[in-house]
């Protein structure tokens, strides 16, 4: 008997969630079903997420954008994180990941889930680590295997739609990293926790060793596995090295095991990657992971732009998505510097939405060009309201025009009376009047 979207799809059954996703994407329900059955499309929606909107991610669909929010040990203001969630969704984020590591994390997660109907992701390992330190008064390395899985169940029960789990961080991958040498070692927080735990306990990664236990939990909630890249490169110099690719090979093997068990999977990717290596990274992931949806952090194309990493992210994200990545995790101007502000979240979401939209045009996603064509028509007519309504960020567009002073001639203050549109309109009108 089918219990997950993947199992229903493989039995030829179109579910209500598939129909809802198809309507949102402008494709047929059968297109969604076929993609899910093949493992190239997923629908992120935990059966416990009552107010949640099913989110389809994958081949042939619009590129999605995720916004990371969450507290830290230094900033535990819940109201601020809820405002970030609202702002992210208002500006077009498709998903929100709660990465809270400070304050009442259970309360924060539940409040974020209640605040929005967007798709919600999390990293349950953070919860297990925090509980070990704060509740049990121990260290991260004192987490038990049961602690880790209890954290996963807690997030599943709360209605989290997808969880990042660093199952590919194994002893063999750590050895490859050591043997080859890396400039920045492990920059993934979950990956670092796992490596530390493995070294201290002289044991294999519990999420790898007990992967079947993980599948039982996620299948029960139809919760999507986002197989995390614990060895993602944290600088350009470490991109596409043996540790990164070895982990990707393992994730490809785990993808097959998960799909065989009826569990939906996506793969997380880098990271910091030079422009000329991005397409190769996408090709490798799609080949090694059997076409599973690819969820990338950036990638950032240079390491020297702190304060502007939403731009380095958008550049890499546009290239990655045009090459086949399906899901972009935003980066804010505060990346590498501080916990992002509400304004940082807004800028990060918009930057990644620009990248996603540009890539969708390049990929030929159905309907991707329609707004661009409409915008061109509005610009030609100097229809400012139409331009604002079509903008990715109408508020900023309106503000900038208002600040410059609205000219009587209807053009902008860049060209004024020498506006090319007005000049051409006058020229064409004169030709018509002359009978030409």
Curated annotation (Swiss-Prot):
Residues given in the record as substrate binding sites: 68, 97, 126, 166, 188-190, 229-232, 268, 295
Keyword annotations of the record: 4Fe-4S, Iron, Iron-sulfur, Lyase, Metal-binding, S-adenosyl-L-methionine, Thiamine biosynthesis, Zinc
Q: What is its EC number?
A: 4.1.99.17
Pfam families from the xrefs?
Answer: ThiC_Rad_SAM (PF01964)
Q: Which GO terms describe its molecular function?
A: 4 iron, 4 sulfur cluster binding; carbon-carbon lyase activity; zinc ion binding
Which reaction is recorded as catalysed by this protein?
5-amino-1-(5-phospho-beta-D-ribosyl)imidazole + S-adenosyl-L-methionine = 4-amino-2-methyl-5-(phosphooxymethyl)pyrimidine + CO + 5'-deoxyadenosine + formate + L-methionine + 3 H(+)
Cofactors demanded by this protein: [4Fe-4S] cluster
The Swiss-Prot or TrEMBL record describes its family as follows:
Belongs to the ThiC family.
Q: What is this protein called?
A: Phosphomethylpyrimidine synthase
Q: Which organism is it from?
A: Geobacter metallireducens (strain ATCC 53774 / DSM 7210 / GS-15)
Q: Lineage from the top down?
A: Bacteria, Pseudomonadati, Thermodesulfobacteriota, Desulfuromonadia, Geobacterales
């Amino acid at each position: 008997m089918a219990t997950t979207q993947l199992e229903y799809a493989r039995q030829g059954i179109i579910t209500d969630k598939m129909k809802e996703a198809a309507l949102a994407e402008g494709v047929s329900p059968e297109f969604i079903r076929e993609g899910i059955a093949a493992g190239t499309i997923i629908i992120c929606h935990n059966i416990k997420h009552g107010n949640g909107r099913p989110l389809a991610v994958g081949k042939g669909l619009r590129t999605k954008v995720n916004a990371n929010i969450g507290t830290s040990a230094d900033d535990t203001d819940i109201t601020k994180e809820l405002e970030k969630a609202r702002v992210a969704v208002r500006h077009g984020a498709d998903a929100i990941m709660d990465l809270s590591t400070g304050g009442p994390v259970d309360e924060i997660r539940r409040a974020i889930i209640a605040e929005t109907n967007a798709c919600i992701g999390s990293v349950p390992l953070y919860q297990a680590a925090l509980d070990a330190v704060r509740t049990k008064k121990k260290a991260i390395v004192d987490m038990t295997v049961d602690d880790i899985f209890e954290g996963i169940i807690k997030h599943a029960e709360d209605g989290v739609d997808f969880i990042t789990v660093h199952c590919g961080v194994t002893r063999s991958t750590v050895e490859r990293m050591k043997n080859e040498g890396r400039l920045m070692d492990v920059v993934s927080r979950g990956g670092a926790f796992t490596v530390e735990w493995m070294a201290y306990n002289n044991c294999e990664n519990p999420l790898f060793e007990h992967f079947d236990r993980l599948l039982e939990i996620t299948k029960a909630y139809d919760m999507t596995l986002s197989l995390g890249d614990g060895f993602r490169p944290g600088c350009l110099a470490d991109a596409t090295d043996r540790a990164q690719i070895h982990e990707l090979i393992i994730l490809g093997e785990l993808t097959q095991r998960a799909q065989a068990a009826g569990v939906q999977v996506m793969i997380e990717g880098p990271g910091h990657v030079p422009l000329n290596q991005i397409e190769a990274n996408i090709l490798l992931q799609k080949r090694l992971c059997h076409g599973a949806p690819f969820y990338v952090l950036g990638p950032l194309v240079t390491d020297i732009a702190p304060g502007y990493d939403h731009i380095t992210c958008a550049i890499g994200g546009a290239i990655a998505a045009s090459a086949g990545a399906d899901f972009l995790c935003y980066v804010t101007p505060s990346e590498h510097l501080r916990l992002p502000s509400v304004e940082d979240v807004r800028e990060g979401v918009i930057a990644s939405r620009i990248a996603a939209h540009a890539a969708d045009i390049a990929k030929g996603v159905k309907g991707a060009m329609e707004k661009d064509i409409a915008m061109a028509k509005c610009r030609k007519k100097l229809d400012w309201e139409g331009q604002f309504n079509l903008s990715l960020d109408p508020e900023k567009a309106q503000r900038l025009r208002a600040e410059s002073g609205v000219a009587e001639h209807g053009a902008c203050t860049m060209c004024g009376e020498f506006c090319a549109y007005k000049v051409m309109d006058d020229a064409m009108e004169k030709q018509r009047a002359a009978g030409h």
